[in-house]
Amino acid sequence: MAAAAYEHLKLHITPEKFYVEACDDGADDVLIIDRVSTEVTLAVKKDVPPSAVTRPIFGILGTIHLVAGNYLVVITKKMKVGECFNHAVWRATDFDVLSYKKTMLHLTDIQLQDNKTFLAMLNHVLSMDGFYFSTTYDLTHTLQRLSNTSPEFQEMSLLERADQRFVWNGHLLRELSAQPEVHRFALPVLHGFITMHSCSINGKYFDWILISRRSCFRAGVRYYVRGIDSEGHAANFVETEQIVHYSGNRASFVQTRGSIPIFWSQRPNLKYKPHPQISKVANHMDGFQRHFDSQVIIYGKQVIINLVNHKGSEKPLEQTFANMVSSLGSGMIRYIAFDFHKECKNMRWDRLSILLDQVAEMQDELSYFLVDSAGKVVTNQDGVFRSNCMDCLDRTNVIQSLLARRSLQAQLQRLGVLHVGQKLEEQDEFEKTYKNAWADNANACAKQYAGTGALKTDFTRTGKRTQLGLLMDGFNSLLRYYKNNFSDGFRQDSIDLFLGNYSVDELESHSPLSVPRDWKFLALPIIMVVAFSMCIICLLMAGDTWTETLAYVLFWGVASIGTFFIILYNGKDFVDAPRLVQKEKID
């Protein structure tokens, strides 16, 4: 078994050092961080000075370097999600960011302002819901991956053995990672969604668990991170695992989602739906092959379910994806194109059964992972469904929940929980739990990528589309529009800073946060507001003749509308764009 991370910790603070004391039974270790030299050493409890200010903490997230120097990030509150095979799983709910420096007197005014902004970015990421950890169980690996490991792997610390794709505090833990003797203080933290339920069908009790692991490679927000990078990492890549634990038997079904794996972008420009751009110069096949080579190594066979529209602005993406699969010619990859919106228009969501019937035989071939109560592997999952739409959120989640239910039906029948001929959909109590969990999963993934809850969750929760659901989709769509255009630059910068895609250099002569604005940025909105206001005033305060009033209204109306279209034409100058890391522009 892996060396567990310490669960109970105390933080002792003095002006010169941070002392992190392990309080687990039998533990005598104390991690010492020198606030001046930043040196990390290991000591024993008797070395903690009695004058130190003491407080309990629940984990070390890591350290980060900002303009003012280093900061220590610790978990101060946690909430128990449940237990996975008798291992407690926690959600971190609050953090504290502690400066190594005692004063900021060494900083200039500009540096002070930059440091304040960087701290706001760090706190923004920490405020995002969905950070999970366990001090005794490896949450970053699927059941199947954990079953195929060597004895040496099982002896490693949680940090050493973790799948680095899903360790969101990997950059913050880089200093602790370099010193194996302190690894029990280093807590790998996953970002995504976890829910656990104790369920009963036919008087038989089993645990049902849903885990979504969000990749920290090519992570970001909706419109600024699309497609793949040169290493083949896809934007918004999420591995979702559904686990059943019954009478010592363990079963799991794994699916993935990720952006269409070619080089494309969709930069916000004030339009409701910016036109996606496919690069004309990038080597798509190189990135595409890198992506699927790694996917096949990790997961096996790939069944791609592409849910984008087959007309309009999404059509070129679907055609390019299909052509890339055909050109690659791999027997390990199968491609299914399903125009979700066309097939399900007019709220005909029952037509999703067409897709399920189409892939049923493939799903049976891929199977699922099952290990019996004696620890013997009964079946392996030989591949995954890789689903995507444009955002890999709303349409994708609907399909994933249906595929997962079909797999769960087979698992529960094999384990003897369901009788022969019994349908999972007929188990009202469990069905309610199942649908709500998948809807919550959809909302979590959507908030982390798009900034709002998911669309279409009324179908996931109830099995049908509702008028209230359509209204909520409209509200979330408007909220997404605002965030994607006017706050996502800051969100993207925050993620890049947290993950180490950008490193702060306090000696940098020019502040990266200082971006000069064109005259249009201030002048055009003011002109539009003034013109629109004058138009309203002219309507309310009629002139001597109706022709005079009409002339004034037309003049100011044309001025306001004209200015609006000029702003729309120059939309990219008005959106909140990232400042720290230059994102690809494929225009």
From Swiss-Prot:
Residues 452-587 are annotated as: Essential for phosphatidylinositol-4-phosphate phosphatase activity. It catalyses: a 1,2-diacyl-sn-glycero-3-phospho-(1D-myo-inositol-3-phosphate) + H2O = a 1,2-diacyl-sn-glycero-3-phospho-(1D-myo-inositol) + phosphate; a 1,2-diacyl-sn-glycero-3-phospho-(1D-myo-inositol 4-phosphate) + H2O = a 1,2-diacyl-sn-glycero-3-phospho-(1D-myo-inositol) + phosphate. It is a multi-pass membrane protein. The keyword Transmembrane applies. The keyword Membrane applies. Pfam families: Syja_N. Residues 122-451 form the SAC domain. GO terms for molecular function: phosphatase activity; phosphatidylinositol-3-phosphate phosphatase activity; phosphatidylinositol-4-phosphate phosphatase activity. Keywords: Acetylation, Endoplasmic reticulum, Golgi apparatus, Hydrolase, Lipid metabolism, Membrane, Transmembrane, Transmembrane helix. GO terms for cellular component: AMPA glutamate receptor complex; endoplasmic reticulum membrane; endoplasmic reticulum-plasma membrane contact site; glutamatergic synapse; Golgi apparatus; Golgi membrane. Residues 542-548 are lumenal. The chain crosses the membrane at residues 521-541, 549-569. It is found in: Endoplasmic reticulum membrane; Golgi apparatus membrane. The modification N6-acetyllysine is found at K456. Detected in brain, lung, liver and kidney, and at lower levels in spleen and skeletal muscle. InterPro entries: SAC_dom. Its EC number is 3.1.3.64. One of its GO terms (biological process) is vesicle-mediated transport in synapse. PROSITE patterns: SAC (PS50275). Its main location: endoplasmic reticulum. Residues 1-520, 570-587 are cytoplasmic. Phosphoinositide phosphatase which catalyzes the hydrolysis of phosphatidylinositol 4-phosphate (PtdIns(4)P), phosphatidylinositol 3-phosphate (PtdIns(3)P) and has low activity towards phosphatidylinositol-3,5-bisphosphate (PtdIns(3,5)P2). Shows a very robust PtdIns(4)P phosphatase activity when it binds PtdIns(4)P in a 'cis' configuration in the cellular environment, with much less activity seen when it binds PtdIns(4)P in 'trans' configuration. PtdIns(4)P phosphatase activity (when it binds PtdIns(4)P in 'trans' configuration) is enhanced in the presence of PLEKHA3. Interacts with TMEM39A. Interacts with SEC23A and SEC24A; this interaction is reduced in the absence of TMEM39A. Interacts with PLEKHA3 and VAPA and/or VAPB to form a ternary complex. Interacts with SACM1L; the interaction regulates SACM1L phosphatidylinositol-3-phosphatase activity and translocation to endoplasmic reticulum/trans Golgi network in a malonyl-CoA dependent manner. This is Phosphatidylinositol-3-phosphatase SAC1. It comes from Mus musculus.
